[in-house]
Amino acid sequence: MKAAALHDYGQPMTVEEIELDDPKDTEVMVKVAASGVCHSDYVFVAGKPFFEGPRPIVLGHEGAGVVHKVGSKVTNVEVGDHVVLSWIYSCGTCTYCVVGRPNMCDFGRGEVIANGYLADGTTRLHKGDVPYYHFLGISTMAEYTVCDQKSVVKVPKDVPLDKAALVGCAVMTGVGAVINAAKPSPGESVAVFGAGGVGISVIQGAVLAGAYPIIAVDNKAEKLEGAMHFGATHTVDVSKVDAVEAIKAITGIGADYTFEAIGNVKVMRNAWDATAKGGTEVVIGGAGMGDEVSLPALDFPFTEKTIKGTGYGGARMSVDIPRLLNLYKAGKLNLDDMVTTTYALDEVNTAFDDLKAGKNLRGVLMM
């Protein structure tokens, strides 16, 4: 099969023929239909990975497709089912899984991510005797992928797979940051730093929650225009004005909730300064390894502000992925306009170049 492999950090991807073994007992082979082009893939191509892992590795962690084969002990899907792939494997037995926080699974966020293996500690990808490794347990930038059954969620067949793929990362991360992590009340104010795929999803989550005003913050006019299309009520162009002053001018006191959807420690500080007393900053973006953010210590007792992180939108994947797709089908979540460009798998490096240039809200590889 064809797959997009990364042989070393900071190098272009190569689309090549590699071998994929059949699924084991609890595993599923998926014919991938679509894979979103996400910043979390790009950082590895750019040489600034979130973690050090084995190589060569087949990237891609935001995907959807059709079940092609199943192992003998698979119980949740059948051949022909449409599925969204989840980049967090949930073991079901660790403390976090047991208390209903599968997105924080110790095993899924530990060994599966770091080692490039599936849950049993081996890889299904290889070229002859040379092993290739799995990215976040799903490797969706390929014609086919094998993953554990716990990494797939069955979805309705009437949802286009290129739209369903977005719920595998960007949309779940952004909408979930609002409805699962922040939980604003109707009428509370929201400011979103970064109007890319995740930021736009935060805006859509804020609309669902009834927040007002909803302020989009970015340095690209075209992204701010797009943010208005998805529900932002105000925009702040940081290439022209100071974000903190502009947000306080709109709200009077700062935003009740600020969301950092970029992964930049300076922006994290700006979001903190733009948060109202008693408000909350929610950090979504992944900064570089070793990066630290500095905050004034006296702000904690004097302003009662809170800063918190959220991973994968606090998702309970088997529950929240279908829930978001039901909202899409009901016309309450706009996925159609989020896909701005589609690419063939052979165009993967062009897709990453366009991501770096900020040309897309979401680019999607179509297999």
Language model region names:
Residues 21-35, 48-98, 103, 111, ...:
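Glycine-rich beta-strand-centered segment in the early N-terminal region that forms part
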Residues 82, 189, 279-281, 306:
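Short glycine-centered segments of the SAM/dcSAM-binding site in methyltransferase folds
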Residues 87-150:
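Cysteine-cluster motifs in flexible loop/terminal segments that predominantly coordinate metals
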Residues 143-144, 150-152, 156-241, 245:
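Mid-domain Rossmann-like dinucleotide-binding core that forms the NAD(H)/NADP(H) cofactor-binding site
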Residues 241, 249, 269-273, 318-367:
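C-terminal hydrophobic helical "lid"/dimerization subdomain
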Residues 275-290:
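ADP-ribose/adenylate-binding Rossmann-like module
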Residues 280, 295-337:
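Rossmann-fold dehydrogenase core element
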